[in-house]
């Protein structure tokens, strides 16, 4: 599939300084403090008084930064390695992305503990809404002018701000929990929906509106997810997505785990993505450490990541078709996934959560006979995809339920932070594997599937075509697997190569310390985004020169995709919402972290 209106994506330049020149010309160089990082983008600190003006300029500049990719905070109070940075108790960063420039810029602002206030930027980027709510929820930073600044991850009755450094990280540091009858009633009452709090009316000119809870326990909600619908008959007048039921504090956990021992936790973010979750994390850590992995490691990582893209998309395909009323395909897609997991298990030893990538390499070399398993799979799957297309995706009922439903264009997708198949279904040719190649993707031949309607049907068809392209990539990995080691020869590779521990006592001691306490990473910041199964996933790491991360920010694609729902579905029927939810392809662990 192609689109006639695809945006031209220029070649990617890391640390592109063009925007810095534009900012200096507009505001003067003295308005900014540049920070040297390993994030691959300019990082500039600005004063709070100029923050909104700077962000508005970047939103309106030629080839604008149309996407607020991420917005979050850092508790700076215990950070020791801050040379050259503005004094700050807390900081908030705004990560902006321009598809037309194919470049990013990060704007930071410092705050003192006694004055945690910033202006809202929801008028510049609508998707700032949830991000600002989360920053308030996690850090207690207020955003003046926000339309509804309230808890989003934690329950409404929660006390404290969990990502502050003085907030306990372990359950044993809290008082024992007991659920009294009074507390239970308070929690139940706090979950009651109040339409007026969200600017909704209970009555129209000639009718009373009905308010319907879809979820948090509903099969079409795809997890613990609640949407409160304001209905006029079956027409959706407005809606409020309610998330946080699956929140596990993944970013807080990262502050108490070593760089190495956090790898299994990444598997549980998008729990259908497997090693795809490991990839941005280990790449970001390797940037901190200055590790360049052998070519064989890159090819192995790409091959396994594409296997998990296929397993995730197969699950999407089956449940999506089931959501619109066809039962049989989901049983076939689950059976087909098992064939992929047989290959994955033979290589990694595990199925859903291998936690198999390592800092500087992978856990072990490819086993004997891996090539035959992979060859059989890549020869078998294309015929199955042909059958799905013919039997289900060309079905007139499915087309009638999904074509033209929940459609949006490229401009709207970028404003809401939509990435992955949701963005490419609008005709925007932005796939990081092509636009910003990582791990050697530039060495592979594959196409980026596009559509042009941006509706529920196109989002499905793009993912089906992506599976075909993943097969092409896996086949090239099979035919061109390099020889060589499966770990980098670097002091911070974890676990280190074990062979030399049998020869030198100093190497044995270093190996013991690195495995037990974890490697010590240089003080710096790094960032890595990848084209994951559900869109762009990234890790933004801050090291203070220790064995654990000072701050780990996990930006997931499903989070902004759910925030976009009200802007797309208003005026549609409840049945259209079900088709829309299925077409998004999300899991709540990816949303709530």
Swiss-Prot record:
Catalytic activity reported: a quinone + NADH + 5 H(+)(in) = a quinol + NAD(+) + 4 H(+)(out)
Keyword tags: Cell inner membrane, Cell membrane, Membrane, Multifunctional enzyme, NAD, Quinone, Translocase, Transport, Ubiquinone
Cellular component, GO, one term:
NADH dehydrogenase complex
Keyword Transport applies: yes
Which regions form coiled coils? Answer: none
Q: Where is this region: NADH dehydrogenase I subunit D?
A: 208-593
SUPFAM superfamilies, A to Z: HydB/Nqo4-like, Nqo5-like
What are the boundaries of the region NADH dehydrogenase I subunit C? 1-184
**What are the EC numbers?**
7.1.1.-
Q: Which GO molecular function annotations are given, in alphabetical order?
A: NAD binding; NADH dehydrogenase (ubiquinone) activity; NADH:ubiquinone reductase (non-electrogenic) activity; quinone binding
- Cell compartment(s), UniProt: Cell inner membrane
> Which Pfam families does the UniProt record give?
Complex1_30kDa (PF00329), Complex1_49kDa (PF00346)
PROSITE patterns in the cross-refs: COMPLEX1_49K
**What InterPro entries does this protein map onto?**
NADH_DH_suC, NADH_DH_suCD, NADH_Q_OxRdtase_suD, NADH_quin_OxRdtase_su_C/D-like, NADH_UbQ_OxRdtase_30kDa_su, NADH_UbQ_OxRdtase_49kDa_CS, NDH1_su_D/H, NiFe-Hase_large
**Which membrane topology term applies here?**
Peripheral membrane protein
Q: Is Cell inner membrane one of the keywords UniProt gives this record?
A: yes
> What job does this protein perform?
NDH-1 shuttles electrons from NADH, via FMN and iron-sulfur (Fe-S) centers, to quinones in the respiratory chain. The immediate electron acceptor for the enzyme in this species is believed to be ubiquinone. Couples the redox reaction to proton translocation (for every two electrons transferred, four hydrogen ions are translocated across the cytoplasmic membrane), and thus conserves the redox energy in a proton gradient.
* Subunit relationships: NDH-1 is composed of 13 different subunits. Subunits NuoB, CD, E, F, and G constitute the peripheral sector of the complex.
State the family it belongs to. In the N-terminal section; belongs to the complex I 30 kDa subunit family.
**What name appears for this protein in its UniProt entry?**
NADH-quinone oxidoreductase subunit C/D
């Amino acid at each position: 599939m192609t689109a006639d209106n695809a945006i031209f994506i220029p070649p990617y330049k890391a640390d592109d300084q063009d925007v810095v020149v534009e900012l200096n010309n507009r505001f003067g160089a003295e308005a900014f403090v540049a920070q040297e990082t390993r994030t691959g983008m300019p990082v500039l600190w600005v004063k709070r008084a100029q923050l909104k003006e700077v962000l508005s300029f970047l939103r309106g500049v030629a080839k604008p930064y149309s996407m607020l990719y991420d917005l979050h905070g850092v508790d700076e109070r215990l950070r020791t390695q801050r040379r050259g940075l503005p004094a700050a108790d807390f900081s908030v960063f705004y990560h902006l992305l321009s598809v037309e420039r194919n470049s990013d810029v990060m704007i930071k602002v410092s705050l003192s503990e006694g004055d945690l206030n910033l202006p809202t930027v929801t008028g510049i980027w609508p998707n700032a809404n949830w991000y600002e709510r989360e920053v308030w929820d996690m850090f207690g930073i207020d955003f003046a002018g926000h339309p509804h600044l309230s808890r989003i991850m934690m329950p409404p009755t929660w006390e404290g701000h969990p990502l502050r450094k003085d907030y306990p990280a372990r359950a044993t540091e809290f008082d024992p929990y007991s659920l009294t009858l009074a507390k239970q009633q308070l929690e139940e009452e706090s979950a009651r929906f109040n339409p007026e709090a969200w600017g909704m009316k209970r009555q129209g000119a000639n009718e009373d509106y009905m308010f319907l809870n879809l979820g948090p326990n509903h099969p079409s909600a795809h997890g613990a997810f609640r949407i409160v619908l304001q209905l006029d008959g079956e027409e959706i007048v407005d809606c409020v997505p309610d998330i946080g039921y699956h929140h596990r504090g993944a970013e807080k956990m990262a502050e108490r785990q070593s760089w190495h021992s956090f790898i299994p936790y990444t598997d549980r973010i998008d729990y259908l993505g497997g090693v795809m979750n490991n990839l941005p994390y280990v790449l970001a850590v390797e940037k901190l450490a200055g590790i360049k992995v052998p070519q064989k490691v890159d090819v192995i990582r790409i091959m396994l990541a594409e296997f998990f893209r296929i397993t995730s998309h197969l699950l999407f395909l089956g449940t999506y078709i089931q959501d619109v009323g066809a039962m049989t395909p989901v049983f076939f897609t689950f059976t087909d996934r098992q064939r992929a997991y047989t290959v994955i298990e033979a290589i990694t030893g595990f199925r859903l959560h291998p936690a198999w990538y390592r800092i500087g390499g992978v856990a072990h070399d490819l086993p004997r006979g891996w090539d035959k398993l992979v060859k059989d799979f890549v020869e078998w799957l294309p015929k199955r995809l042909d059958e799905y297309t013919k039997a289900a995706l060309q079905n007139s009922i499915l087309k009638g339920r999904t074509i033209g439903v929940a459609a949006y264009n490229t401009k709207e997708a970028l404003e809401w932070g939509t990435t992955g198949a949701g963005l490419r279904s609008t005709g925007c040719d932005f796939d990081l594997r092509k636009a910003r190649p990582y791990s050697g993707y530039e060495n592979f031949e594959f196409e980026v599937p596009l559509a042009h309607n941006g509706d529920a049907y196109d989002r499905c068809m793009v993912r089906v075509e992506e599976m075909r392209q993943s097969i092409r990539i896996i086949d090239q990995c099979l035919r061109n697997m390099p020889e060589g080691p499966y770990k980098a020869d670097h002091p911070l590779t974890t676990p280190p190569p074990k062979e030399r521990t049998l020869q030198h006592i100093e190497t044995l001691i270093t190996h013991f310390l690195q495995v037990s306490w974890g490697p010590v990473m240089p003080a710096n910041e790094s960032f890595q985004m990848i084209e994951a199964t559900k869109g762009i996933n990234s890790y933004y790491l801050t090291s203070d020169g220790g064995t654990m991360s000072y701050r780990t920010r996990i930006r997931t694609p499903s989070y902004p995709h759910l925030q976009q729902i009200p802007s797309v579905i208003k005026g549609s029927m409840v049945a259209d919402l079900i088709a829309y939810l299925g077409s998004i392809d999300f899991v709540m662990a990816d949303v709530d972290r």
